[in-house]
């Protein structure tokens, strides 16, 4: 795939809305290969490990979520610096034009959601964590985390599409109808929230400070399959303490390794 770069219009819309839809961000073969990998996932109980990947569902309603999925096979490794979006995330959260320019993947998830599943709304600019903060200052973007959700099948009405509240990454006040995340409150009818429908191979890019979640999947058949890669500055750490295996670091390209391990360990010589 030819590398894609953000346009001036992309920058404007990202600034105003907090998200972009990258149509056909992934080529057809990658989507096929990822779906085959999903088909081959073994049955993993919650909190169970499969190699260096762990099933860690965000809530009981969110469905099957395999964290550290970059360790789950070669197709997931291709996503690290995929040309359909890598230049976007470098631009928005890679500390462009600074002495710490670069990226780090602090979370990567393979997600399967079936009928009835959803994800409560979370994040938003009000009292938001620095980790997910939106910032544009002195002519550069300085976002704390930018997410890429890649659709491995069409995600339309009733399929449990991601929902967002455009502009909420800049909110200075709390949403009074936010609901209770811990109780699993649904965001389907939250005023201001809109579903983001995707075609197979499309990607949703958004700053983590945007209010977002997953609408209820009402389709009784099939499942919603997506990958979620969260990018941030090179000085970040993985959210849940995962480490990338030495085998993975040795196997990927030099550029990919710089994203997985942008700051190599500094240890004393053993000789």
Protein language model features and the residues they cover:
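Short, structured patches in soluble enzyme cores that scaffold and shape functional sites
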Residues: 112, 123-125, 146, 150-154, ...
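Non-heme Fe(II)/2-oxoglutarate
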Residues: 9, 44, 50, 55, ...
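Non-heme Fe(II)-dependent double-stranded beta-helix
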Residues: 1-16, 23-133
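Short, P/G- and charge-enriched loop/turn segments at secondary-structure junctions
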Residues: 131-138, 191-192
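Secondary-structure boundary elements
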Residues: 91-102, 138-142, 152-159
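Short, charged/polar surface micro-motifs in flexible loops or helix N-caps
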Residues: 85, 113-118, 126, 155, ...
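Double-stranded beta-helix
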Residues: 141-145, 154-213
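Extracellular structured ligand-interaction cores
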Residues: 19, 107, 143-147, 159, ...
């Amino acid at each position: 795939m030819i590398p894609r770069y953000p346009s001036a219009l992309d920058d404007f819309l990202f600034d105003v809305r907090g998200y972009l839809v990258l149509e056909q961000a992934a080529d057809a073969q990658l989507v096929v290969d990822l779906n085959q990998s999903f088909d081959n996932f073994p049955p993993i109980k919650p909190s169970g490990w499969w190699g260096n990947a762990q099933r860690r569902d965000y809530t009981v309603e969110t469905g099957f979520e395999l964290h550290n999925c970059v360790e789950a096979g070669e197709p997931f490794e291709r996503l690290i610096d995929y040309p359909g979006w890598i230049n976007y995330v470098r631009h928005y959260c890679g500390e462009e034009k600074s002495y710490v320019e670069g990226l780090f993947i602090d979370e990567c998830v393979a997600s399967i959601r079936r009928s009835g599943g959803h994800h409560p709304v979370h994040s938003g600019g009000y009292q938001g964590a620095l980790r997910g903060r939106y910032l544009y200052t002195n002519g550069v973007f300085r976002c704390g985390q930018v997410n890429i959700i890649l659709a491995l099948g069409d995600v339309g009405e009733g399929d449990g599409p991601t929902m967002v509240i455009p502009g909420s990454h800049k909110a200075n006040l709390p949403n009074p109808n936010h609901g209770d995340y811990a109780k699993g409150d649904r965001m389907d009818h939250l005023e201001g929230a809109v579903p983001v429908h995707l075609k197979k191979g499309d990607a949703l890019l958004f700053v983590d400070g945007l209010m977002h979640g997953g609408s209820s999947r009402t389709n009784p058949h099939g499942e919603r399959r997506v990958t979620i890669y969260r990018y941030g500055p090179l000085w970040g750490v993985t959210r849940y303490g995962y480490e990338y295996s030495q085998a993975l670091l040795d196997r990927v390209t030099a550029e990919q390794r710089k994203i997985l391990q942008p700051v190599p360990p500094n240890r004393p010589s053993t000789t």
